[in-house]
Design a protein with these regions (language model features):
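Short, intrinsically disordered, charge-balanced linker/junction segments flanking boundaries
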Residues: 194-197
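Active-site donor-binding acidic/aromatic loop of nucleotide-activated sugar
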Residues: 165-167
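Cytochrome P450 core scaffold surrounding the K-helix E-X-X-R motif
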Residues: 151-156
Length: 197
């Protein structure tokens, strides 16, 4: 089985009940750290590509971003520029993928609304200012969620879509502590040029 931990529990219980051998590949919240020594343009281009490939519906897609607090604005702008370069349009662009279906899109939209209601600043990256409300393809633009907190569902569940929570850190140790206090991620991404970090 490949998929979410919550579903895997049911699959594993059914397999155990029937003594069926099982291998599980589970997703998780794969963090991405951009360090102070990173080339911001290069890092944000790679993060945007990783997050938007298949509309973020890849088990190893970056799930949240940890950035130095003084570089947050520059990094957000880099993500916007990288997205616009890859996908100047999205709705009619065959290279920009839809999410799995209406139910999945509604789940992602609920994460966005929950984050807004709990104080996040949501930046919708829509380079051509297209109207996504009048489409039947279940496409969603990138939503950057600034100020994401642990109370928000977007930080509690695997996203599997084009939503990117951003949290800031003062010191690299704080970013590492942030990762270590959570469940073990499936993947982790680091962007930086300082070997001591």
């Amino acid at each position: 089985f490949t998929g979410a931990t919550s579903v895997a529990r049911h699959v594993m219980a059914a397999a155990a009940k029937n003594l069926v051998p099982l291998t599980l590949e589970l997703g998780g919240k794969s963090p991405t750290i951009i360090s102070r020594s990173a080339d911001v343009a290069s890092a944000t281009e790679r993060v945007a590509m990783g997050k938007l490939m298949n509309a973020g519906q890849i088990c190893l897609a970056p799930d949240y971003l940890l950035v130095p607090e003084e570089k947050e604005g520059e990094i957000i702008e880099g993500l916007k520029a990288a997205t616009a370069k890859m996908y100047p349009t999205m709705l009619a662009n065959p290279d920009y993928t839809s999410v799995l279906g209406a139910r999945h899109r509604e789940r992602l939209e609920a994460h966005v609304e929950d984050a807004r209601a709990k104080g996040a600043d949501v930046v919708v990256v829509n380079p051509a200012n297209e109207d996504f409300s009048k489409q039947n393809t279940n496409k969603m633009p990138l939503h950057i969620i600034r100020g994401a907190t642990d109370e928000m569902t977007v930080m509690q569940e695997e996203i599997f879509g084009p939503l990117l929570p951003v949290r800031t850190y003062k010191a690299v140790d704080g970013a590492i502590d942030e990762i270590n206090r959570r469940d073990r991620p499936l993947g982790l991404y680091w962007f930086g040029q300082d070997e001591l970090e």
